[in-house]
């Protein structure tokens, strides 16, 4: 859905809903399947309420498809798209880890997921990554870039203690959703936002950003990685 539907049916908002349902009535649409994630399911709920309020006999059905895996489905079932995204992401992550091991380097990669860390965690777990950073880790403390960098540095140091001079970290893009405006401004990140008010994270190279900051911190600590 390219446009977020208003939460009520009053005034001009009602006109918008009437325009949508005029199309349904014109083509006698009685079954409407909407495939998507959180915003799409929100749209399904609003259209269903309007159909019930206006007495239009229609079945509006939401099909939960999102790689974020953040829709509460019965029996904790994963959303459509999550497992395939995790599998494909794991293929890439394994290749990155092989490169790290054979070259003696550390690499940082990011995974999609908006405000949820399921995809990053699933990929990292499948590939036994030594460091996985997801927003859910910070449920009792504000997320800051410094904390994320400290986590990665600690993983590097711990592996060096056991003579493992390589590794990889996967970071969920969701951490960007939880950063304060002051934190974002201090690091020079400027987001554009979509019609639903979500930052367009695809336009920012998260992995390169954290890799650059990690390099700076390691240089300050005189750790040659």
Description of each model-found segment:
Residues 1-27:
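Glycine-rich nucleotide/cofactor/substrate-binding loop typically near the N-terminus or early
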Residues 22-23, 31-36, 42-57, 74-224:
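Accessory alpha-helical/coil subdomains and C-terminal extensions
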Residues 64:
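Anion-recognition interface
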